[in-house]
Amino acid sequence: GSSKKLSFEDIILSGVADDKGLYLPTSTTLENLSYLTQEDLTYEDFVKTIFIALDKNSAKYVEDLSIYPGFESSPTPTLKEVDEKRYVMELFHGPTKSFKDYALQPLGAIADRRLSELGERGLVIVATSGDTGSAAIQAVKNSKNIDIVVLHPHNKVSEYQRRQMTEVIQDNVLNIAIEGSYDDCQNIVKTLLQNNSFNRKVVSLNSINWLRVMGQTAYYVWLTKQFTSPINIAIPSGNFGNAYSAWFGRENGLPINEIFCASNVNDVLTRFI
């Protein structure tokens, strides 16, 4: 695109690019990920290694940082055998029981550290159809340098998801129900990110933030390490962010064959593909 290249420090707090596209790594920004499958690392070190592979300057943000503060136990995913050669990777052991905790917890911690370094207070604006909002809130609710505003479509999230978001009582957390769809919420977020009149750092934790995709790639790195041959992956998909993370890992050397996107009656992605 026509947008300028940004450093790792800039990407932490960035969302939509000036040309309305998304920031992506250049061909020289990220080393091949295949070597990670040969390393004996804890899961948390997997994530840190991926961020450092993205940019060596990230080391000062992650090496001594607890990037899964909301997890009551180890963030290592659980792999359960269903039958011969079929397994389920469980990603619901985080604070909100959503796979999104695995990417948002590190991103929230890293963003808080970056803002502390700058001596600034950031504003996170998130659009959600349910899971992202609660996971984002849990990622930053104890942050010293971040306030968060979550937009969700009124009466279009489950009662469980609504309560996960609206029952967090913190001075730095604000929930807003929007009359409209999730896309309406997302359009508001994109407009605010492009036309920042808040006189402060505005941050997105949606999948438009590249570091969130990297955090999701981490559990595919871990998954491929559990097998001695390439695997196929079927991913429950509301949108393409999670599947894209698997694709990105495959493109950078992870032993993944086919990637299947599975959807329910909410089949917008299926119809799009």
Question: Over which residues does each language-model region extend?
Answer:
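PLP-dependent amino-acid enzyme catalytic core
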Residues: 1-273
